């Protein structure tokens, strides 16, 4: 049975933020190893609660056991991986320029230092990996920041169990009181109070464009504006090039049917737009894709709110002028279910109707029929920023259409060739972020240890005595980290 949690009051939030600030003053002085040990302890506790938390997560999200176990394992991996990166220290971007033999020059040493308390909003579609102990939380801890998590009300019980595991790990590793806090709040006011509190120094968010933009605007209206790192979804356009479509159109269609319906389409990297040039090859692709989608049964979505939004946005998209429905379930599906849906429209309709650009979160995709490559280019130039874009193309296709390839590259943070955008690898080379409205800051990623940098700022120390410097910048390099010394990357001591 789902447990109901009371929204945190303004007074409770104020107390939480004050404790978080006091924890920051202590935690920022903890060593990189201490941070890493804390994160590894959280990972261990998450493994310890696996048997207890998985059934709760399954009940709250309607996600299957295999998916839940896999996501929890990914969350554990993230904590260990980001902890290792924190300890290794290259993310600090330590820079040293010594005065040398010129007494008129200062000794300058720069590194990243933590921002302060970070508020993290749990995501609805990833109860582990993007929520209470997820990537934003792990990155903030690695950067030296305390974390205050606002649980997502759709899986509040899961979040509560995970929060208990973090608190235990904090106690076991001697972390300062207030290093982590967990609050509930289904109301808008709870989130607003957290963002607007003067001791909040950054926000991490994964969710809708409306939600992320609201937090971003609030943060900008503060007396002291703060960064909001919001990942707000994407339609992840796919561009079918002529030779590739002719050679492998049927296989590509089958591959994309699986991608569109994976997890009932509830991934921020779900391919919601597919562009191709009109002709027999595109029609054959469309026919195979439609046939494959019709084989996929409706399934329960994460929670009633997401299901309701899917049906409303789906209906709005399908009722637009010049939109042809290719696949849609007959009659009414159960209220909580998402049904595989495919539509098509001309590029002219896409260019003239902003509704066709909008994300329909769920198992939905829209095929855009272009007259030729030039019209496809025009469509690209009128497409908003994305997390991913995909080129289904041969090498010859790429060489014949360089302007189109360049334009697609400008859209996104991750450019995929001959693959699917669903599936986000946790590694240093991953970029999970893109131009607005995909995210509020395309310079950063929310996946991979480079995401640690979101919650830190550069600090330069000028003419400090060596023993007064942070260990990371001292002459002997006692931590053995990589540093750029007088413009040369090295691990050596000065």
Predicted region positions:
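NAD(P)-dependent aldehyde/semialdehyde dehydrogenase
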Residues: 254, 276-387
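Rossmann-like NAD(P) dinucleotide-binding subdomain of oxidoreductase/dehydrogenase enzymes
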Residues: 91-258, 275, 279-282, 493-494
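C-terminal core of ALDH-fold dehydrogenases
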Residues: 333-336, 373-469, 489-492
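Short loop-to-beta-strand entry elements in the cores of soluble alpha/beta enzymes
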Residues: 38, 143-158, 179, 224-244, ...
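N-terminal Rossmann-like NAD(P)+-binding subdomain of aldehyde/semialdehyde dehydrogenases
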Residues: 1-106
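Extended hydrophobic packing segments that form well-structured cores
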Residues: 470-494
């Amino acid at each position: 049975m789902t447990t109901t949690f009371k929204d945190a009051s303004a007074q409770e939030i104020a107390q939480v933020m004050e404790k978080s600030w006091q924890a920051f003053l202590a935690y920022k002085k903890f060593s990189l190893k201490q941070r890493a040990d804390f994160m590894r302890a959280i990972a261990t506790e998450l493994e310890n609660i696996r048997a207890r938390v998985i059934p709760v997560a399954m009940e709250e999200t309607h996600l299957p056991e295999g998916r839940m176990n896999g996501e929890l394992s990914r969350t554990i991996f993230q904590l260990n991986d980001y902890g290792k990166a924190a300890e290794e220290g290259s993310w600090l971007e330590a820079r040293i320029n010594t005065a040398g033999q010129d007494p008129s020059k200062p000794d300058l040493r720069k590194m990243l230092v933590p921002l302060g308390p970070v508020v993290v909003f749990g995501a609805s579609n990833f109860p582990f990996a993007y929520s209470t102990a997820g990537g934003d939380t792990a990155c903030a801890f690695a950067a030296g920041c305390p974390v205050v998590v606002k649980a997502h009300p759709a899986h509040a019980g899961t979040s509560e169990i995970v929060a208990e595991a973090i608190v235990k790990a904090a106690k076991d590793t001697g972390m300062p009181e207030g290093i982590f806090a967990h609050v509930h709040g289904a109301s808008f006011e709870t989130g607003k109070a957290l963002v607007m509190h003067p001791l909040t120094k950054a926000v991490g968010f994964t969710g809708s464009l409306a939600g992320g933009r609201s937090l971003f605007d609030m943060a900008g209206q503060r007396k002291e504006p703060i960064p909001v790192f919001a990942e707000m979804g994407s339609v992840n356009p796919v561009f079918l090039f002529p030779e590739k479509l002719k050679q492998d159109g049927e296989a590509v269609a089958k591959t994309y049917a699986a991608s569109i319906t994976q997890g009932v389409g509830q991934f921020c990297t779900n391919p919601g737009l597919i562009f191709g040039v009109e002709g027999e090859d595109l029609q054959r692709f469309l026919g195979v894709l439609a046939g494959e989608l019709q084989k996929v049964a409706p399934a329960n979505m994460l929670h009633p709110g997401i299901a309701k939004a899917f049906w409303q946005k789906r209906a709005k998209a399908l009722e637009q002028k010049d939109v042809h429905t290719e696949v849609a379930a007959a009659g009414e599906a159960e209220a909580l279910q998402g049904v595989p849906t495919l539509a098509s429209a001309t590029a002219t309709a896409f260019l003239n109707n902003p509704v066709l650009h909008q994300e329909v979160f769920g198992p939905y995709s829209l095929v855009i029929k272009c007259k030729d490559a030039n019209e496809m280019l025009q469509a690209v130039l009128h497409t908003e920023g994305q997390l991913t874009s995909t080129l289904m193309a041969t090498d010859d296709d790429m060489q014949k259409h360089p302007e189109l390839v360049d334009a697609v590259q400008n859209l996104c943070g991750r450019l995929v060739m001959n693959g699917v955008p669903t599936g986000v690898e946790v590694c240093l080379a991953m970029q999970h972020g893109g131009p607005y409205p995909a995210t509020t800051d395309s310079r950063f990623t929310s996946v991979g240890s480079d995401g640690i940098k979101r919650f830190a700022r550069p600090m330069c120390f000028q003419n400090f005595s060596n023993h007064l410097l942070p260990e990371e910048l001292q002459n002997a390099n006692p931590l053995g980290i990589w540093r750029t010394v007088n413009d040369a990357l090295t691990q050596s001591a000065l």
